[in-house]
Regions:
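Extended amphipathic alpha-helical interaction segments
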Residues: 167-199, 206, 210-213, 222-230
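Sec-dependent signal peptide recognition
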Residues: 1-6
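Extracellular ligand-binding interfaces
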Residues: 410-491, 496, 505-521, 525-526
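Short carbohydrate-recognition loop motifs
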Residues: 397-417
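Long, repeat-rich segments with strong aromatic
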Residues: 207-301
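Extracellular carbohydrate-recognition regions
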Residues: 378-401, 527
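Extracellular glycan-targeting catalytic surfaces
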Residues: 16-189, 243, 265-268, 273-381
Length: 527
């Protein structure tokens, strides 16, 4: 009975100590192996995100640390540290990811350099906006530290993670970041919800790094029950409307992205926050996607806990349709893991894939690599054009046109519509025809709307095609023969693999929408 008494005493005082999984904040060991496998196997569309990651200066092992700083802040006396500190923390995180993908120790050493310098130097986070600084920047840094602590150990690497690193880094998070987070939890609500969510994602991440069950439980308790706009029930309504939906869209994307990150950390630790309140995060993501695609969504004037943010009468238009890199994580959980449906988020991803960098330190970004759980996509055949504008607009540039919903279709809407895509590898010798399906063509438009361009003797030349040059199939597929076509300088179009720019210029359309479905190069007219 003494053993039973002892167990009950421990439970009543501190609860059961959690057996934490490591690495286990955003990326478990299994996830890191999966990410490396996506790159090794050249999986599409994940390689698009990887190529974007590699191109970031902060992902290079040549990155020059701009700190470390003793004091950091987002504004005020030490506001000058915001951007360089964010860059440094992103560099630690990106290089930790790159190390786990490439096994190039130079990436590992760069991440270690940044972590060690800040752990030995950083003393305090100053107002204003200290909770955001501690929450957003702290989460990125603790993810980097978690990965390096468990994947670059001293036993196997000369410059690997040491006992001293553990003590110094743990002390930094306990003494610099946690006091800000804890104070926010104790304070009466005074902010929009993204603050509390940012604080919670740092708290749950740091709790894992510190193996601190109480900190972890406090984060989950706040997520469900906190008296703040930044809890799940207070930030996302049953309809999916977000507390900041009437404010603007950037903060909504920040908030939903952070909620998904909190849920992913908990998932790696064996707790399902994704399913909380009947999959409330999914509902918020779908509402956010649907409204930003231009569809009608229900909206009610929100009564927030502070009383300061209860006067937004309609959806905030600032940032509408400007999608951040936060959609892959929730989509891959609900659709790929749980086999549920997120049709509007899928439409968003069809437009923005592959995801690139997050906004500053707000979210990690590169979700098409870091969180992709889908199948390997179709490989493009060398020299073949296959542009599906209904599913992917990556690389397309639009002049004076934007996608808007009309007649339940996403159309290009403007008084003048033109677009182009550079860097398309096209082999006209193998694919002598280009077919373009247009399901809605404005009554008034430029008749010579299709063109190809590439450099001849270092100068651009243009091959322009009119509607009269096309064979029209099935009423709305325009097929152009490229063989023998002459440029503005009389040059015959090359039959070799060529780097071309594809252009469409429909001119003044009187505001009528244009709906281009796809563009394909084909071998013959039987397709």
């Amino acid at each position: 009975k003494y053993i039973l008494f002892y167990l009950l005493f421990c439970l009543s005082v501190g609860g059961w100590a959690k057996d934490f999984v490591h690495p286990g904040i955003l990326h478990s060991s299994e996830a890191l192996r999966r990410i490396a496998g996506l790159v090794k196997n050249d999986v599409n569309p994940s390689m698009g995100s990887f190529n974007k990651l590699k191109a970031e200066p902060e992902a290079s092992y040549h990155y020059c640390i701009q700190g470390p700083f003793r004091f950091i802040s987002r504004s005020g006396e030490y506001g000058y540290t915001k951007s360089p500190c964010e860059d440094d923390f992103n560099a630690a995180y990106y290089n930790a990811i790159m190390w786990n993908i490439t096994k190039d120790r130079r990436h590992a050493d760069k991440a270690m350099e940044i972590i060690r310098n800040y752990a030995a130097t950083l003393e305090k986070i100053f107002p204003m906006d200290a909770p955001l600084c501690a929450g957003l920047q702290g989460f990125i840094l603790v993810n980097a530290a978690e990965m390096m602590r468990y994947t670059y150990v001293e036993e196997h690497n000369e410059n690997g993670w040491t006992y001293k690193d553990t003590k110094q880094t743990e002390a930094m998070f306990r003494n610099v970041f946690l006091p800000i987070l804890s104070e926010f939890y104790k304070t009466k609500p005074y902010t929009n919800g993204n603050w509390g969510i940012a604080v919670t994602k740092a708290q749950i991440g740091i709790s894992v790094f510190l193996n601190d069950t109480k900190l972890y439980d406090d984060a989950l308790d706040f997520f469900y029950h906190g008296k703040d706009n930044g809890t799940l029930p207070n930030y996302v309504a049953e309809t999916g409307q977000i507390q900041e939906s009437g404010r603007d869209q950037a903060h909504c994307m920040l908030g939903i992205g952070c909620l998904a990150e909190i849920a992913e950390v908990a998932w790696n630790q064996g707790d399902d926050l994704y399913g909380a309140l009947d999959n409330r995060i999914m509902k918020g993501c779908e509402y956010l996607s649907k409204s930003n695609l231009g569809y009608d969504v229900p909206f009610h004037v929100w009564k927030d806990l502070t009383g300061k943010y209860s006067n937004w009468q309609s959806l905030g238009q600032a940032g509408m349709g400007e999608f951040r890199a936060v959609f892959e994580l929730p989509y891959n959980h609900y659709v790929e893991r749980k086999k549920m449906e997120m049709p509007y988020t899928k439409m968003v991803l069809n437009r923005i894939r592959p995801e690139g960098a997050g906004f500053t330190c707000d979210n990690p970004g590169f979700g098409t690599l870091l969180f992709y759980l889908g199948k390997d996509g179709e490989r493009e055949r060398k020299g073949r054009i296959n542009e599906n504008l209904k599913e992917n607009l990556f690389g397309w540039q639009f002049a004076a046109a934007s996608l808007k919903l009309k007649d339940d279709k996403m159309m290009l809407m403007s008084s003048g519509i033109s677009c182009k895509k550079k860097g398309i590898m096209y082999d006209a010798g193998s694919y002598p025809y280009i077919a373009i399906k247009i399901s809605h063509l404005p009554k008034n438009h430029n008749k010579n709307w299709f063109a190809l361009s590439y450099n001849v003797m270092s100068a651009p030349e243009f091959w322009v095609f009119g509607e009269s040059d096309a064979q029209i199939m099935d009423g709305n597929i325009y097929v152009f023969s490229i063989h023998g076509a002459k440029s503005n300088n009389g040059t015959e179009f090359s039959k070799r693999l060529t780097n071309v720019t594809l252009l469409m210029d429909f001119g003044e359309t009187g505001g009528e929408g244009l709906d281009v479905e796809w563009i394909r190069s084909v071998t013959d007219l039987e397709f």
